[in-house]
């Protein structure tokens, strides 16, 4: 399906702009995730971080609306175009928008914390998960923008690991002696990490999945779904 989509894009000026805008959405999301993670885990918090996070989130939302409008206008003017291609685009831009929302939620955890995170304690539970999510950002963009099937399939495996680790974190937190504040904040971080990873993989797997299966990757993983060969 995705090869047809890329052929469809060729020579289409408006879709070239759509891809540029979508790439910008992913870049903005990765940038604020990096800033928020640094503030959360290293207590490296610029004074204007809150304003930056909220402004970038608004930018991501504007890009999503712009992309959707272009697609609708194109379908109106050229109704014979293969609509499944446009449905794919509509789906992945929503995933990109949700990543921005969850990153904003992650920032809000910083405001809930009574004291800065103890990195050693955090690593006991999360074991470098933030680095794995940053890798997912990069691999997702490469998979989608560069039509990299191998990279898309690799994200299946990494996201599966992140999901299982997030579920295990919640079990461990429930049995821990952390303070209520720490326990709740760590649980929220695990939840947001899991959702960010899931939306990233929804995007990357649009390269290898048919349109009818988009957005159901995390449910398939829960029942032992295997990535396409």
Regions found by a protein language model. Name each.
Residues 1-229:
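Cytosolic, long alpha-helical scaffolding segments
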């Amino acid at each position: 399906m995705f090869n047809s989509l890329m052929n469809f894009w060729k020579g289409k000026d408006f879709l070239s702009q759509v891809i540029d805008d979508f790439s910008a959405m992913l870049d903005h999301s990765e940038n604020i995730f990096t800033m928020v993670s640094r503030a959360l885990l290293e207590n490296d918090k610029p004074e204007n971080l809150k304003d930056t996070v909220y402004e970038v989130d608004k930018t991501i939302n504007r890009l999503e609306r712009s992309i959707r409008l272009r697609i609708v206008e194109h379908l109106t003017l050229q109704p014979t175009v293969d609509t499944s291609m446009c449905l794919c685009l509509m789906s992945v831009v929503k995933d990109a928008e949700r990543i921005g929302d969850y990153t904003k939620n992650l920032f809000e955890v910083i405001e809930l914390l009574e004291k800065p995170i103890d990195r050693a304690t955090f690593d006991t539970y999360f074991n470098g998960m933030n680095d794995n999510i940053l890798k997912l950002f990069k691999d997702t963009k490469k998979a989608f923008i560069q039509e990299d099937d191998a990279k898309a399939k690799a994200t299946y495996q990494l996201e599966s690991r992140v999901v299982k680790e997030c579920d295990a974190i919640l079990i461990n937190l429930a049995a821990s002696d952390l303070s209520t504040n720490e326990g709740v904040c760590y649980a929220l971080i695990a939840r947001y990490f899991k959702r960010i990873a899931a939306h990233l993989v929804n995007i990357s797997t649009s390269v290898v999945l048919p349109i009818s299966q988009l957005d159901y990757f995390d449910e398939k993983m829960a029942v032992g779904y295997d990535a396409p060969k």
